[in-house]
């Protein structure tokens, strides 16, 4: 009790100090509404000692010793900001010279304020920073730029010398800090040029800025120049008056359009003579042409550039010849067209220009009309909004209203719960060992619900992840995600709904279900409530049997199903905690893996699992990445490598030819002295006593003739049998050799290398990472590795997992199609609630074998999802049961989810293989708190940030820049055209991706008549449409973009020259409502075979043509660009979207919005520079790129 008045329990105590009677405490108290008693929900001891430091004392903080927080700046306010969502800091607490920005990683000292139970940082500094010298500005788009393709900077936060304005290709010195800025991990804090140009200090000219629009020289021009909204195909004219209010005559030298509008919708007449936009007369299409022909693209040659831009006002020549412009027509020699003079305007007189707009391009558009006088320019913006007739099909049907439906809050005195009496689970699955519940702590739930700082409950969240806080930190993050899911589900509870009948079952209609609002799966539990007249409530427990669009088929108590007479019911959704409980259980099991697996630092080489010769007919190429040649370009010593047996270490070579001294056994003694001879041969390997163990020479010339297996990085070259001595055989136990062949002979060198390294398993149990960028054959490599392990190691038992059913099904299908495993060797284990209708026919036989978990556990190749791997815990399977665990698409699984299969492998001799791409989609985490503290970082991504797995071009330049003992990066892309691969390769993969796709496929659409530039299969179509929402759905859609998507699909599917099957076209859009609207339009034109979906639905897939609709188009909300852009600001989502197509990529979006994002800004810059941009006018920062 506190003051004999306030009750509290031990759970409410947050301080680590033991409380004593008489001790002063600070408490947060709530009143019990029933008893009117007071209960403390937070109690913290007041320390007897206070710091003398006035700065700390003035803050009124309760703990005298600050704690350390490692986190990311998640928001910035005026003069302050927040770290990891909840920890406040003021700019006064930031170290000198550092001005933090959103995304910066910082190290802070913080306190907990006792009165508010919130954390406040008292010192903030960058987590990591460095200086880079003589680096080049590789990109500059508006206010954002990039240095050396890897360091982001914004002119809004960059410190520059006075008078210096960065320009592309400048050589600069910079100080950079670690920061998550889209696809970049460094941000420039300050920059200085190495050598200043003569033009330094001149501000960049803005020819179309506010100054241009002002009246000048006593000339006044009409300002009302908007055409309003026009239907596509309509025309409208307006008159622009030009009045001379001065004392002297003014000569209107010429009138012209700046040609921002690529659809050439505007033309003007002056003094009775018609004048069209230069460059448009010959190239434009007559007004009467079909409006469905899009934007009437010019058939430019491949090497031609877009129409030239108008010169700015400083380029007016003294002789009065202003605004000269070249025009370029279809394949014709450009001709200079002089604008006709407008004539003299006497004082007090006025003239006029008639501007006509012929609406062609859906969406908003802006053009610039330039009135060129002898010594100045006056400009006026011509604006129009064009709507198409097809937009009526998808117009807003119901005004948007995001109001939570009121649920019944009737106080009840009693309730009765009725459960399903029939067996819910598959009867053939006997699961005697059930997982613990791992309930969410009440204190944590109150923290979230009452918005109390989470660090008051779990200070460990502020620490970097390590072995000591591993379980507690991830357990807390899992609970945070669960709490968010429960809160989110409550918002979708329904009141007084009537169920429909479907045979003997009942069907519940859930609005918004198709948009995953709420997110339901087969097997989830629902509670249906019925209130009697006496206030008594009966709860019926039901389970989801089937989901079709917005209809949910339920399994309830048979008695209720028969007696139900369409009475209104209240519906309460519940969160399925099965996967979360398996994650909690896995966290307890994987502790045995320890630091060596979860936080690897040193490499301990094991004996190879398999030795022998590979078929020379299949493998005759030495790529320099084998075990026989680990090189360092800088001559530095390598990472510590040890061996835990008596065998000699492998040949590890430095470029300087010196031996490496830190290669030891577990007893710390050196094993070998490894040197290098002039002929590149494998050198002598000596024992500790100086006697030769074996002599095995292999020169470059006779590589194809040697009969000894070429070992991979980190293992020993086995001596030839002919030269083996008894002493050698006693010293080294060589596994029985066998000739081996690849089941898939068309694998490339990197793929074969990865298979060998996995098969050898030199670094087990350290996870081996197969880094597979898009289209590089990652899954093919995994299939080969599984088959090789299965046949080379008869004692192996392999668990192959993936985060999703689709990915696991794909692995099973590919193994089936290989026709290598015997039917009794492989099984596909599904979740209990998965419906057979969702399983493809080819793998159904393997799934039937997986229905009995006991029987399935005896198969040697077991395929399942990461979550369903937890079924094996429930039948008593424990550590060491599986010899090999493969996790495909490991980047999409959260770390606790990935741990579920890893908990079943041996920590001594088990082999872990993680395959995926850390630059593509990660785990789906919805709790912002859980994301802020790292639950959205996959195990694959975290390991690749560890020193042992880091990219190091100096140390491992010959091995793909990664330690070949631990990582193989696949770089040969078999999917996309070179023009489509260039940008993602530069942004995400260090320009290393190689084009290896079938030329017949990727060049099949280079002659399509609608390409802005022939031979370049990319279109960026600018659409300044309107974004909208309707009904109760918070999802956005853009009618103008949806119509344009439909038109492109029609043109592709019905093209005479380059017809594309509708099944070869995919449409990606981030919003469910836009998916729905596009499907309506495609259904209207009989193109229902075209797949339309979110980015997540396309990961791992490829299409001949991809059309992307970005939707967001509100240019007025830029107070928080990333929040406003939503899904679009995720660089991983962007990477997946643009790497799906083989032969053609079409992007539709508003360039004025998208330019704010670094990735989309780079795509816009790439498109404009290559002459493939079309559509609406560009933002000012991109206009200069148009030639």
Swiss-Prot record:
<feature type="compositionally biased region" description="Basic and acidic residues">
    <location>
        <begin position="699"/>
        <end position="720"/>
    </location>
</feature>
<comment type="similarity">
    <text>Belongs to the DNA2/NAM7 helicase family. SDE3 subfamily.</text>
</comment>
<dbReference type="InterPro" id="IPR041679">
    <property type="entry name" value="DNA2/NAM7-like_C"/>
</dbReference>
<dbReference type="InterPro" id="IPR049080">
    <property type="entry name" value="MOV-10-like_beta-barrel"/>
</dbReference>
<dbReference type="GO" id="GO:0007141">
    <property type="term" value="P:male meiosis I"/>
</dbReference>
<feature type="repeat" description="5">
    <location>
        <begin position="686"/>
        <end position="696"/>
    </location>
</feature>
<dbReference type="GO" id="GO:0030154">
    <property type="term" value="P:cell differentiation"/>
</dbReference>
<feature type="region of interest" description="Disordered">
    <location>
        <begin position="686"/>
        <end position="727"/>
    </location>
</feature>
<dbReference type="GO" id="GO:0016887">
    <property type="term" value="F:ATP hydrolysis activity"/>
</dbReference>
<dbReference type="Pfam" id="PF13087">
    <property type="entry name" value="AAA_12"/>
</dbReference>
<feature type="region of interest" description="5 X 11 AA tandem repeats of [TI]-R-N-[DN]-[GS]-Q-[SP]-I-T-[NK]-[IVN]">
    <location>
        <begin position="642"/>
        <end position="696"/>
    </location>
</feature>
<dbReference type="GO" id="GO:0141196">
    <property type="term" value="P:transposable element silencing by piRNA-mediated DNA methylation"/>
</dbReference>
<keyword id="KW-0347">Helicase</keyword>
<feature type="binding site">
    <location>
        <begin position="772"/>
        <end position="779"/>
    </location>
    <ligand>
        <name>ATP</name>
    </ligand>
</feature>
<keyword id="KW-0067">ATP-binding</keyword>
<keyword id="KW-0547">Nucleotide-binding</keyword>
<keyword id="KW-0217">Developmental protein</keyword>
<feature type="repeat" description="2">
    <location>
        <begin position="653"/>
        <end position="663"/>
    </location>
</feature>
<keyword id="KW-0744">Spermatogenesis</keyword>
<dbReference type="Pfam" id="PF21634">
    <property type="entry name" value="MOV-10_beta-barrel"/>
</dbReference>
<keyword id="KW-0221">Differentiation</keyword>
<dbReference type="InterPro" id="IPR027417">
    <property type="entry name" value="P-loop_NTPase"/>
</dbReference>
<dbReference type="InterPro" id="IPR047187">
    <property type="entry name" value="SF1_C_Upf1"/>
</dbReference>
<feature type="repeat" description="3">
    <location>
        <begin position="664"/>
        <end position="674"/>
    </location>
</feature>
<dbReference type="GO" id="GO:0007140">
    <property type="term" value="P:male meiotic nuclear division"/>
</dbReference>
<keyword id="KW-0378">Hydrolase</keyword>
<dbReference type="GO" id="GO:0034584">
    <property type="term" value="F:piRNA binding"/>
</dbReference>
<feature type="compositionally biased region" description="Basic and acidic residues">
    <location>
        <begin position="296"/>
        <end position="307"/>
    </location>
</feature>
<dbReference type="GO" id="GO:0034587">
    <property type="term" value="P:piRNA processing"/>
</dbReference>
<protein>
    <recommendedName>
        <fullName>RNA helicase Mov10l1</fullName>
        <ecNumber>3.6.4.13</ecNumber>
    </recommendedName>
</protein>
<feature type="short sequence motif" description="DEAG box">
    <location>
        <begin position="888"/>
        <end position="891"/>
    </location>
</feature>
<feature type="compositionally biased region" description="Basic and acidic residues">
    <location>
        <begin position="322"/>
        <end position="339"/>
    </location>
</feature>
<keyword id="KW-0963">Cytoplasm</keyword>
<dbReference type="GO" id="GO:0045786">
    <property type="term" value="P:negative regulation of cell cycle"/>
</dbReference>
<dbReference type="GO" id="GO:0005524">
    <property type="term" value="F:ATP binding"/>
</dbReference>
<keyword id="KW-0677">Repeat</keyword>
<dbReference type="InterPro" id="IPR041677">
    <property type="entry name" value="DNA2/NAM7_AAA_11"/>
</dbReference>
<dbReference type="GO" id="GO:0005829">
    <property type="term" value="C:cytosol"/>
</dbReference>
<dbReference type="GO" id="GO:0071546">
    <property type="term" value="C:pi-body"/>
</dbReference>
<keyword id="KW-0943">RNA-mediated gene silencing</keyword>
<keyword id="KW-0469">Meiosis</keyword>
<dbReference type="GO" id="GO:0003724">
    <property type="term" value="F:RNA helicase activity"/>
</dbReference>
